[in-house]
UniProtKB/Swiss-Prot annotation:
Catalysed reaction equations from the record: [(1->4)-alpha-D-glucosyl](n) + ADP-alpha-D-glucose = [(1->4)-alpha-D-glucosyl](n+1) + ADP + H(+)
GO terms, molecular function: alpha-1,4-glucan glucosyltransferase (ADP-glucose donor) activity; alpha-1,4-glucan glucosyltransferase (UDP-glucose donor) activity
Protein name listed in UniProt: Glycogen synthase
Upper taxonomic lineage: Bacteria, Pseudomonadati, Thermodesulfobacteriota, Desulfuromonadia, Geobacterales
Record pathway: Glycan biosynthesis; glycogen biosynthesis
Sequence similarity: Belongs to the glycosyltransferase 1 family. Bacterial/plant glycogen synthase subfamily.
Keyword Transferase: yes
Enzyme class: transferase
Listed InterPro entries: Glyco_trans_1 (IPR001296), GS/SS (IPR011835), Starch_synth_cat_dom (IPR013534)
Length: 484
């Protein structure tokens, strides 16, 4: 099959979160399965700064935005043996950040990504590349399914192309004022309840959900959750309308990238069959961060955005207990100001068992996964989550809240799991979290049982292989909708 991935970020070119990891790793796995896979994203300043062997192409793209014909240049490079196309427009993409600044999102994001979506379709025709499936990701690409359904419905070039739309995080929907319709080149016929209208605003993700041939999201549990009023972010009714076309496919982990046996950032490599290096990495992490190098004290690691979504409202309440307990807590991340201040205050007070590391430090993250005994993810919601998969791979036993992809990957003996690999709790309360932390600390003291639990986690297979096979099935289903 010819499969085109359209995304606003792709590792290593541009990244703000897990979306970029998925849009790099899944294409690589599909390529290994024999498909003609290509990727397209905007040519941001971040991409330009990174180099990446990018070359100028001979094509250009055009799109009418806000009543004006806007032009963009075509550039290209590769991700391994996968062609990567980039659309350049300095007005829209030559900025310091992808989506906005600390003050908020760029006010013209609707125009920026409308230009990108229209540019993608224009470029495909000029290149004479007819994908069997266009796989779109999150609201920034949401106009593509809608345009193919409404504007390109009679266009023979796209008549046999299936469209899949993947929701990575339903909380970010592309909500804009009604007045932005014309700026995106859309007339008033799009502003209806069965299209983009959403409580008087424009909702781009809603349009994609109603227009795509198939919709996927990034875990089976999250797929069920978003169809409920509690977790549907106002779109549960729309998703219910498309229930038969909505599928949950668990994201995988790039096992080539995340492998303790080959990771050059570790103090000593190790594996499930030769796990001795795990202890060396724990000691190295403790020394690096100024913690007491004690093998019998459990290290709890957190690599996360510091936000309420990630459970930091619970952690904030429990910090005094962490400080008083016989454990070491290592935190790496950046995020909301109130949590940054809390952690910086703890750091300033010199709590000897807490290491706070503010910022984005990619060289430290693997050391935390390798040096931690327990990896903590108490998320309020988590569409899929990669941290728990990395932790399992690196022998850090995950402790998670039972939600989204965390519920699909971490299994607790207390819940009747016959092959437990971690600890989980359900009620989103400080009490439920601390009870589970206490359980994990007790379990850590039984060294024989702990070693078995750790090795069972390291033996789990959450690579992209099974997920890619499932996507193959869904691509074929999308093509069947086109009579192919």
């Amino acid at each position: 099959m010819k499969i085109l991935f359209v995304a606003s970020e792709v590792t290593p070119f541009a990244k703000t979160g897990g979306l970029a990891d998925v849009t790099a790793a899944l294409p690589k796995t599909l390529k290994k399965l024999g498909h003609d896979v290509r990727i397209i994203l905007p040519f941001y300043s971040e991409v330009e700064r990174g180099g990446h062997g990018i070359r100028k192409g001979r094509k250009s793209v055009e799109a009418v935005i806000d009543g004006v014909m806007k032009k963009g240049l075509f550039r290209h490079t590769s991700l391994g043996d996968i062609p990567v196309y980039l659309i350049e427009n300095k007005e829209y993409f030559s900025r310091d950040n992808l989506y906005g600044t600390a003050a908020g999102e760029y006010p013209d994001n609707h125009r920026r990504f409308a230009f990108f979506c229209r540019g993608v379709l224009d470029l495909l025709k000029k290149m004479d590349f007819r994908p069997d499936v266009i796989h779109c990701h999150d609201w920034q690409t949401a106009l593509i399914p809608l345009l193919l359904r409404r504007e390109k419905g009679e266009d023979l070039f796209f008549s046999k192309t299936g469209v899949m739309f993947t929701i990575h995080n339903l909380a970010y929907q592309g909500l804009f004022a009604k007045e932005t319709l014309a700026e995106m080149g859309l007339d008033s016929s799009y502003f209806t309840i069965d299209c983009l209208e959403y409580y008087g605003k424009v909702n781009l993700m809603k349009g994609a959900i109603l227009s795509a041939d198939l919709i996927t999201t990034v875990s089976e549990t999250y797929c069920r959750e978003i169809q409920t009023p509690e977790s549907g972010n106002g779109l549960d009714g729309v998703l219910g309308v498309r229930n038969a076309d909505l599928h949950g496919v668990l994201n995988g982990l790039d096992y080539d990238l995340w492998d303790p046996a080959t990771d050059r950032g570790l103090y000593k490599n190790y594996s499930v069959t030769a796990p001795a290096g795990k202890a060396v990495n724990k000691k190295g992490l403790q020394k690096l961060l100024g913690l007491e190098p004690a093998a019998d004290v459990p290290v709890i690691g957190i690599v996360s955005r510091l936000t309420a979504q990630k459970g930091f409202d619970l952690l904030a309440e429990l910090m005094p207990k962490f400080v008083r307990s016989r454990l070491q807590l290592v935190i790496l991340g950046t995020g909301d100001e109130k949590y940054l201040k809390l952690l910086q205050d703890i750091k300033a007070r010199g709590a000897g068992n807490i290491s706070v590391n503010i910022g984005f430090h990619p060289e430290l993250a693997p050391k935390i996964y390798a040096g931690s005994d327990i990896f903590l993810m108490p998320s309020h919601y988590e569409p899929c989550g990669l941290g728990q998969m990395i932790a399992l791979r690196y022998g850090a036993v995950p402790l998670v809240r039972k939600t989204g992809g965390l519920a699909d990957t971490v299994f607790d003996e207390q819940d009747g799991a016959t092959e437990p690999n971690g600890f989980s709790f359900e009620d989103y309360t400080p009490e439920a979290l601390w009870e589970t932390v206490s359980r994990s600390l007790q379990a850590f003291d039984d060294k024989g049982a702990w070693k078995k639990l750790m090795k069972r986690g390291m033996s789990c297979d959450y690579s992209w292989d099974a997920s890619a096979r499932r996507y193959e099935e869904l691509y074929r289903l999308a093509l069947a909708r086109k009579g192919r």
